[in-house]
Amino acid sequence: MKRLLIVALFLAAANFAQAQEKIEWLKFEEAVAATEANPKMLIVDVYTDWCGWCKKMDKETFTDPAVIKYINEKFYAVKMNAEDNKREFDFKGKKYSEAKMAATMRVQSYPNFVIIDPTLQNITQLPGYRQPTEFLEGLGQIVHNGFGSK
């Protein structure tokens, strides 16, 4: 009985620890406020509800421990639905919906990852599905090319 309890506690602790390891997604305006207080780049995951490759990124790439750690350390992560016209926020004195902001960022395919520097200027886009290793390589090149906060 004691062993069973120990095994159950171990499994519960492992599941709890695993559940805590996830990307800290923010709303766009939250990420902007955060980078003003503590400068880091933003990574904006622009997706749609119908996008199968977006769901594959969520399921496979964004659950990879190395991807989670790297994004949480180097970026403020944002999820943005390119077809959401309801939720509005202010940015640089203008009102935007998520759809309007995605269009302003010139996103034309999904998934698409817009990288924004700490001064809130778009740097580049990483379009399309990427496996964890490939995704980390792309992000690493951006950070190591001097765009990241030091």
Could you tell me what each predicted segment is?
Residues L4-A13:
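Sec-dependent N-terminal signal peptides
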Residues N15-Q20:
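Sec/Tat signal peptide C-region and signal peptidase I cleavage site
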Residues K22-W25, D64-Y96:
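Thiol-based oxidoreductase modules, predominantly thioredoxin-like and allied folds used
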Residues E24-M41, I71:
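A short beta-strand-turn-helix
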Residues E36-A37, K69-N72, M105-S109:
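Extracellular/periplasmic catalytic domains that process cell-envelope and extracellular macromolecules
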Residues N38-G52, A77:
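Short active-site neighborhood of thiol/selenol oxidoreductases, capturing the structured segment around
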Residues T48-W53, T61, A82-K86, Q108, ...:
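Solvent-exposed loop/turn segments at secondary-structure junctions
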Residues E60-F62, Y96, K100-G148:
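Non-catalytic, surface beta->alpha helical segment in thiol-disulfide oxidoreductase systems
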